[in-house]
Curated annotation (Swiss-Prot):
Keywords: Dioxygenase, Endoplasmic reticulum, Glycoprotein, Iron, Metal-binding, Oxidoreductase, Signal, TPR repeat, Vitamin C. SMART domains: P4Hc. It is an enzyme of class 1 (oxidoreductase). Residues 1-17 form the signal peptide. Inhibited by poly(L-proline). It is found in: Endoplasmic reticulum lumen. This is Prolyl 4-hydroxylase subunit alpha-1. Binds 1 Fe(2+) ion per subunit. It comes from the Eukaryota.
Length: 534
């Protein structure tokens, strides 16, 4: 058994030693296999306990029959020399063997296995991260708690439900984060399911305790008071609720007095005109970003759409593409976003993923002030960097990018492979360094990021679009395709319309890889112009 346990420790994926499982679906799939192994180990333990109990039961039944016969005529029974010998033998040795069997701990193997694997289990950060991802999906895709709880998500293959206890735990996570908006939503869902008769370890009193306070924190004093009274109907002795009731009633009486004193002049005041709705073009970026993620973005006019074409592209008469040109499609006009179809094969994708998986780490961003790499809440993914020297496939992919874009990849960054986790996203950002970030790529010595090439290495069941809030463009993932755009004008000035984001993955697994091409080496491939915005 010790040998098996040691072998399992050696064979466990080393990638699991790194925290942040919720940021990568790829690594979460390893957890599924580990949990399956634990279930198998648990079933082996149950079987061993059942076998042990079966032996004890057989022994008890045999002794029950024997003692029933012996107690009818004890003297006559032990008068038989064989019975006398067997009685001595049973009491001297066999009962000791039974004692050893009963005391034998059949759980050693399972406990050893569990102890080893527990060090690779998700931690509190993962659980909180997964919960906050659900909140993010809920907000971005306008999902109500009942839809999520019932598992009615678009594109799902494996329907899953949330219990009242699950909803309660989600509400507690939000409460701990002082996110009272989501606390209210999930505590209300837990309460609804309990009132519908769902059996749970969670009681209504606990739910109402959190719910009433969350509602109060959002300024709805009437509802908070109503919920507190409902709690006290269930538990009249609840100390905190009784205290809250007195406090809420005191606050309400003060507000009523203040309103009475201020109401005298209101009859003479004219009602202020209501403001007109704000045009979509002027909505805050966050709202535009979420609308684009839902496919509700600004639609391109028919006149502009007529300027978008599909074509065969031979890379400016590149010999590799003359007989088999690449399929190219215009996704957007300004900035010009081009999609290449069937540009990376399934076999190449699997090799890239296999190379990246062992070294996936939480994706970081460069701090604009210090230049240091750091993790941030608005980038939920894991990434790895692959050099062209590591595998012929990576080298071939790099050359394909060079042939199709006409840009030199020798000064580009390594191929970055990213896998998005639960609600995985990267909120609006620029790929290029702005003027207030002069040190962003100084260590590379290759200038600014002139262009971005992005491979989609998986289809996504729902969500996961690449969106450009400044212009209203949405580009949806399609396995085997790639999109390309310039981050800088030919003058070297940054194109601020390329500000983009990776929408949260609602359902599915999103794999991408990208290549950031830099200015150095492009002097004759993309000559500089005198006009700032050309």
């Amino acid at each position: 058994m010790i040998w098996v346990v040691l072998m399992m420790a050696i064979l466990l994926p080393q990638s699991l030693a790194h925290p942040g499982f919720f940021t990568s679906i790829g690594q979460m799939t390893d957890l599924i296999h580990n949990e399956k192994d634990l279930v198998t180990s648990l079933k082996d333990y149950i079987k061993a306990e059942e076998d042990k109990l079966e032996q004890i039961k057989k022994w008890a039944e045999k002794l029950d029959r024997l003692t029933s016969t012996a107690t009818k005529d004890p003297e006559g029974f032990v008068g038989h020399p064989v019975n006398a010998f067997k009685l001595m033998k049973r009491l001297n040795t066999e009962w000791s063997e039974l004692e050893n069997l009963i005391l034998k701990d059949m759980s050693d193997g399972f406990i050893s296995n569990l102890t080893i694997q527990r060090q690779y289990f998700p931690n509190d950060e993962d659980q909180v991260g997964a919960a906050k991802a659900l909140f993010r999906l809920q907000d971005t895709y306008n999902l109500d708690t009942n839809t999520i709880s019932k598992g009615n998500l678009p594109g799902v293959q494996h329907k899953s439900f949330l219990t009242a206890e699950d909803c309660f735990e989600l509400g507690k996570v939000a409460y701990t984060e002082a996110d009272y908006y989501h606390t209210e939503l999930w505590m209300e869902q837990a309460l609804t399911q309990l009132e519908e008769g769902e059996l749970s370890t969670v009681d209504k009193v606990s739910v109402l305790d959190y719910l009433s306070y969350a509602v109060y924190q959002q300024g709805d004093l009437d509802k908070a008071l109503l919920l507190t009274k409902k709690l006290l109907e269930l538990d009249p002795e609840h100390q905190r609720a009784n205290g809250n009731l007195v406090y809420f009633e005191y606050i309400m009486s003060k507000e009523k007095d203040a309103n009475k004193s201020a109401s005298g002049d209101q009859s003479d005041q004219k009602t202020a005109p209501k403001k007109k709705g704000i045009a979509v073009d002027y909505l805050p970026e966050r709202q535009k970003y979420e609308m684009l993620c839902r496919g509700e973005g600004i639609k391109m006019t028919p006149r502009r759409q007529k300027r978008l074409f599909c074509r065969y592209h031979d890379g400016n008469r590149n010999p590799k593409f003359i007989l088999a040109p690449a399929k190219q499609e215009d996704e957007w006009d300004k900035p010009r976003i081009i999609r290449f179809h069937d540009i990376i094969s399934d076999a190449e994708i699997e090799i890239v993923k296999d190379l990246a998986k062992p070294r996936l780490r939480r994706a970081t961003i460069s701090n604009p002030v210090t230049g240091a790499l750091e993790t941030v809440h608005y980038r939920i993914s894991k990434s790895a960097w692959l050099s062209g020297y590591e595998d012929p496939v990576v080298s071939r992919i790099n050359m394909r990018i060079q042939d199709l874009t006409g840009l030199d990849v020798s000064t580009a960054e390594e191929l970055q492979v990213a896998n998005y986790g639960v609600g995985g996203q990267y909120e609006p950002h620029f790929d290029f360094a702005r003027k207030d970030e002069p040190d962003a790529f100084r260590e590379l010595g290759t200038g600014n990021r002139i262009a971005t090439w992005l491979f989609y290495m998986s289809d996504v069941s729902a969500g996961g679009a690449t969106v450009f809030p400044e212009v209203g463009a949405s580009v949806w993932p399609k396995k085997g395709t790639a999109v390309f755009w310039y981050n800088l004008f030919a003058s070297g000035e940054g194109d601020y319309s390329t500000r983009h984001a990776a929408c949260p993955v609602l359902v599915g697994n999103k794999w991408v890889s990208n290549k950031w091409l830099h200015e150095r080496g492009q002097e004759f491939r993309r000559p500089c112009t005198l006009s700032e915005l050309e």
